Each structure stands twice: as structure tokens, then as C-alpha cells.
């Protein structure tokens, strides 16, 4: 019997930013962690900033996504995002600096509501980048912060 793979497509406003096939796609949706394999039931979910693992055989592509929407059919996973980066292209020092800057804004008692909302978003994105980096180094963890 021939192995059946999911078609995986990650798209941004600039077009397709990742295409591949997978035995399994794992990600965090609005209802929690999901493992998606060929034949999965159809679903549509929002995604927070986080890690998407696209596994085929012994190889896993680890992707940081800025958040978005995932559409699943029995044969395809389409992820629509504002931004996506492969974990191997992420810079740990930059992610840590972004995290520290966001925390500084959140500590400021004079920060406006708008500044606090933006800092919370940047903090979640920096944490997601760090998780993607850790995941690509074999240290995958999933934790709600």
C-alpha cells in the first residue's frame, strides 16, 4: 500500500511561504494542541503565535508562525499567517532582546493601554520564536504562558 501524505501549504499576504508533504502536522490551535494526519476530519481554527512542526519520515520542518488561521481537510493543511520563519533562520539573541523590550514596557506604570496591548503581542511573538528555536534543537515543549 502506498503511503499517503498530507499536502501542507503556509501562505502569507506575499503568497506561499512553505509547501510540503507530511506524515503529521502538529500545532496549537484555539482549542489546544493538535496532531493532524492524513484522513483528519475537516476543521477551521485560529492559531496564536507559535510553533508548527511538519514531519515527514525522520525529518521535521520547524516553523514559527505569527498567528493566523488553519484549515484542515482530510488531505490538506493550509495555514494562513501574517508572518512565518523557519526555526533555523531565527536569531535567538534578537528574540531575547524583543522579549526583554516587551517586558520593560509592561513594567512601566505609565504605559498606555495601546502600548500594553502591543507589548503583550510582541512578548507572545518573542516567546513563540524562542519555542521554535528550542524545538529545532530537540527541546520542544508546549506551555501556555
From Swiss-Prot:
Molecular function terms, GO-annotated: ATP binding; proton-transporting ATP synthase activity, rotational mechanism
Keyword field contains Nuclease: no
Subcellular location: Cell inner membrane
Major localisation: membrane
Keyword Lyase appears in the UniProt entry: no
Entry membrane topology: Peripheral membrane protein
Pfam families (UniProt xref): ATP-synt_DE_N
UniProt-listed InterPro entries: ATP_synth_F1_dsu/esu (IPR001469), ATP_synth_F1_dsu/esu_N (IPR020546), ATPsynth_dsu/esu_N (IPR036771)
Keywords carried by this UniProt record: ATP synthesis, Cell inner membrane, Cell membrane, CF(1), Hydrogen ion transport, Ion transport, Membrane, Transport
One Gene Ontology cellular component annotation held by this UniProt entry: plasma membrane
Assembly behavior: F-type ATPases have 2 components, CF(1) - the catalytic core - and CF(0) - the membrane proton channel. CF(1) has five subunits: alpha(3), beta(3), gamma(1), delta(1), epsilon(1). CF(0) has three main subunits: a, b and c.
Task of the protein: Produces ATP from ADP in the presence of a proton gradient across the membrane.
Family: Belongs to the ATPase epsilon chain family.
Protein name: ATP synthase epsilon chain
